[in-house]
Amino acid sequence: MFPFLAPIRSANHVEQQGTKYYVEITFLADSPYSRAPSSTGTEKSVIPTLRNLDDLETVSNKSRSSEGVNKLGSRPNSRSSAIVKKTSVSSLPTSARSEGKSSPIPVKDAIPAPARHKNKGLEMSSAMMELFGGGGSTSPAPSKRENPADAPSDRVVSNAKLSQPGPEWFEGFEQMDMTDIELPPDPNCPAEKVLRGEKSTPDFDSDWQEAKEDVLDPQSYPKSFNPAESLPGPDIGAGVDDEEEPEAEAQEMEEPQYESKVDEKDDDDNGSSSSKKGHPSEDGDSTRNGETPTDRRNSGAIEETADGESSAQSAAEKKNSGDDGNGGGGEMSILLVKNAQIVNDDAIFVADILIEDGIIQNVAPNLEAPEGAEVLDAAGKLALPAGIDVYTQVTDSSVDDLSTGCKSAIAGGTGTIVEVVRPRGAESVVSAVKRVKNQLEKSGISCHVALSVAITDFCEQEMSELVKNEGINSFVLDGVSLTDDKLLELFEHVKRLGALIRVVPENKSIVAMLEKKMLKLGVTGPEGFPQSRPESLEADRVSGVCVLGNLASCPISIVQVSSADSLAAIEKARASGALAHAEIASAAVTADGSALFSQDLRFASAHLTDVPLRRGAPDRMIGALSTQPLVVCTSGHRPVNSATRVAAKDFAIAQKGSTGAEERMAVVWERAVRSGRIDAMRFVAVTSTNAAKMFNMYPKKGRIAVGADADLVIWDASGKRVLESSRAQSSQENSMYDGLTVHSVVTATIVGGKIAYQNGEVREAPVAGGFLRLSPNSPYLFSMVGQRDKFANVERVEREASSQQQKPQQNGHHKNSGDFDRNRTKVMESSIDFGGSAANRPRNPPGGRTTGFW
């Protein structure tokens, strides 16, 4: 009837006298229409009377308190009225607020509770305020007991200016004095339990300090755990400085020390901060007494790679060996990149990057430069993970060598390349790998170089040796003439090794026949190159290897994809469950092959790349870069002698290849990002992060985060330039990219924590690159393979063995009885055998003989 009233505890009597209704009720919360004794307890309460529905009598309490302060109820309400003055609310039980009456339900004595807050009686500590926000309570504290000897349950709250349930049943009613209302406490209320002493308020400050001590205890971490490991975001390591620990220097030769980069907040209550091991010092000076953070830290952020090898060495080992952990040598260096907009494949934020000894030590805003650090201002520019180009061929009949190829890579923002090693003549694959490694040691390369081996036959033992001993985790199938059964066996073996198989989508035998056909037709120029390699033939090759790869549950990658039909075959295979991935050629993103039909032979010959360029392919390639998972863009960098190629008598013998390591990232940015097809994060994924995941480099490479290798590029997206071979690092005279305008500039490329390229010049000083060993079993490729092997999609029917041998059949029927099975001798004779011999059959069966009718 009155939904805005508090729940009724009990009703003593109800009388009906004419049109008046008398109801005696007791409320859970104060109401201006409930009976309440006067402050003196002597005057009689007035019962509200309803004379009729149209005529309302204003009722007031004669014993209104002279102090003008009402006692509190226990039920808040947000309603307000201009007629009725608000009363206050208290969270104390009614029995605890009563001074003159005792509760009908006895209340146990409780120990004094702490000061009451607005949070249901539980005080919020400073640590909880840090976690959940908020400040000090604005609710008035309860008044002290008039009699200190009274139990806590007898306390009375005197503040009556808080919200109270609205009294406005009807207009014209006045508020009654609702003091000393008694209600039994709720035994299930957590706040009442605190008052009764069943559970004291927890000491959040003490628990918070103990938890932080446990987190910051270096002994609580395994050797491979890095407390400073970060997730993307601008708050990584914010305001982190190191505390001076002289005692740790004596132990740096014994074992690595682990320091946490946890920023301790100030205490809200007293404004003081704790000073513990691993925390910042009080003055916040990270270079106090000339001591740098690296001097106090042995190995920065140490992580374990997939094969269990540590990715960072101790400081003592680095000083003795001169190895910076990235393949190069040199003294320890400190670099601070300021005000950069950091772009990872999943986040964009503004922060500074502190690099020490080739490892990213801190990512946070407003970092202070340590003593002796080199500062690189990147304001207004992007900081991206350095590019990873997984298909270069500078060691295969190229005018570039490893040194020149690496310079081209860093000039384009690439910090790591995967060089494809091809055996020469009768050279074994193991010998070819060792030959290239020797070249890497002799050359002053400025970027990281990993190797991928091209195989021409199924060499099982040599492949196993390369994976286990030489740091190889991928193989390239280029023109391998294997039958399907041998190819399936090869895929099974590669899967067991945990390596990635990469397939060049070209049927060499059929292509040779088509080239001869073109030459007979008089097509000798560059235009014959794409016509001798139809898209359908390329798609058929892709479809075939994807089917075999799916049968073997082996991850495969199709390299140098340049046709829409090949992409369609890959997408179809993935829909069928194949673990197939695409490596898009940067040349196919740039040009559509129309230049091959140009009248200018020199210009047309420059477009004779490893892959035939197709008309209408660039848009399809960009679409694949924006949608397919683990798709990468490769350059296929193999510059050739332009004069020799032009002088070739036909396209079949002309050398194929072009530059691309320096132009790859700029072309993808121009064609895909600037056109709005992909964003900057996807750009990072297709040029760096996805390749790092496929070749088991992630998260050491392909990401800007604490503990990752300091390989990054400072990218100016507001710049503009025209690509020209004369200003490129490659030795090729002319390129298919000549004359292309791009709206991006590589300001600086950092490899291994050192600036290798800046403002258009390659730094010849200390190199930080070198051979990069790759571990097998990338989790981004083989995690699904293990599950597929456990739950093979095969069906097996369990059948019980037959207890007796099946009886022989005669004339299509089982022999039912006897040792004699009579064959049919007449066409109309029944094939049913009733048993017995023919001599004993009755001649006159019931119903008469049937032979007489015939």
Curated annotation (Swiss-Prot):
Belongs to the metallo-dependent hydrolases superfamily. Hydantoinase/dihydropyrimidinase family. Pfam families: Amidohydro_1. Expressed in ventral cord and nerve ring (at protein level). Isoform a: Expressed in nerve ring (at protein level). Expressed in the nervous system, two amphid socket cells and weakly in non-neuronal pharyngeal cells. This is Protein unc-33. InterPro entries: Amidohydro-rel, Metal-dep_hydrolase_composite, Metal_Hydrolase, Metallo-dep_Hydrolases_sf. It comes from the Eukaryota. Residues 240-257 have a biased composition (Acidic residues). GO terms for cellular component: axon; cytosol; dendrite; neuron projection. Changing G328D: In yad26; in the PLM neuron axon, increases the number of unc-9 puncta close to the two original gap junctions and the length of the first gap junction, also causes mis-localization of unc-1, loss of unc-1-unc-9 co-localization and a reduction in the number of unc-9 leaving the gap junction. Gene3D superfamilies: Metal-dependent hydrolases (3.20.20.140), Urease, subunit C, domain 1 (2.30.40.10). The keyword Transferase does not apply. Changing D389N: In e204; uncoordinated. In AIY, ASI, D-type neurons, impairs axonal guidance and outgrowth and in some cases causes ectopic axonal branching. Its main location: other. It is found in: Cell projection, Axon; Cell projection, Dendrite. Residues 57-114, 130-327, 794-854 are annotated as: Disordered. Keywords: Cell projection, Neurogenesis. Signal peptide: none annotated. The keyword Secreted does not apply. Residues 58-68, 75-97, 802-811 have a biased composition (Polar residues). Residues 193-202, 279-298, 816-827 have a biased composition (Basic and acidic residues). The lineage of its organism: Eukaryota, Metazoa, Ecdysozoa, Nematoda, Chromadorea. GO terms for molecular function: dihydropyrimidinase activity; filamin binding; protein heterodimerization activity; protein homodimerization activity. Isoform a: Probable monomer. Isoform b: Probable homodimer. Isoform c: Probable homodimer. Probable heterodimer composed of isoform b and isoform c. Interacts with unc-14 and kinesin-1 motor complex light chain klc-1; both interactions regulate unc-33 neurite localization. Interacts with fln-1 (via calponin-homology (CH) domains and filamin repeat 18-19). Isoform c: Interacts with vab-8 isoform a.
